[in-house]
Amino acid sequence: LDALNNAQSSGNPYNIESVQVIISSGVMWSAEVKQGLLEHHDMKLMDTMGSTEGGMGSSVTTRDNPPATAKFGLNPGVIVLADDGEILEPGSEKIGLIGTSGLVPVGYYKDEKKSAETFREVNGIRYSFPGDYAKLESDGTITLLGRGSNCINSAGEKIYPEEVEEAIKRNKEVFDCLVVGVNDDRFGQKVVAVVSLEEKIDAEALIEQTRKFIAGYKLPKEILFVDRVERA
């Protein structure tokens, strides 16, 4: 999107009229980025969710279908399972693990513990649970929260880094962001954000602006500014 915007600003825009579909998987694709792409060209944006163990859901955005962040229609045979073993129904206030049935692997090679955690039977049906948590909305779609193993436990509250990252990136001053949990004597863990900027802003102002998008307890306790956010 940045390349398209920069080329257009310089008066030498790319010709992308032949592009019909863009498919994304494995990263958080925000509504703002989708909207920006559609402003350049009318096409289909397919956002897919899955893992090595199996596909789970997808969404398609067009100019006639407003974009959303981390919202997917579920594939057949996919459930959301609460930690207490309840299969969630649309509109439930609980969150749960996403599980997919069908062609489920036998297990991980020489890793019985991980196999038992990931591949389980529910009501006689074998499912794969890679570890992603979601909320099942009243319309039958899910809102993906994030991977349970990445969840930050701060003062007894569960905070998903992906949600905080997307909230911070909604600020026009932010170019990129990565959120992690850091051990803390008071909270157990605290939310820390690593941020690269598009425009100058201080940490206090950025936190205050982000308060419009997420609950206060999810806000970062500390922000580290860097020239570039590095990912392995």
Predicted regions and their residues:
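Core-facing hydrophobic residues within beta-strands of well-ordered domains
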Residues: 16-19, 75, 174, 220
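AMP-binding/adenylate-forming catalytic core of the ANL superfamily
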Residues: 50, 101, 106-107, 117, ...
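Short Gly/Pro-enriched turn/cap motifs at secondary-structure boundaries
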Residues: 67-73, 118, 124-125
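Gly/Ser/Thr-rich phosphate-binding loop
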Residues: 7-67, 77-79, 89-90
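Acidic-histidine catalytic/liganding microenvironments
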Residues: 112, 122, 168-172
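Beta-strand->loop->alpha-helix junctions that form or flank phosphate-binding loops
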Residues: 46-53, 70-72, 180-183, 224
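Short proline/glycine- and acidic-rich turn/helix-capping motifs at secondary-structure junctions
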Residues: 223-232
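Conserved beta-loop-beta connector loops within the AMP-binding
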Residues: 79-100, 136-139, 199-203
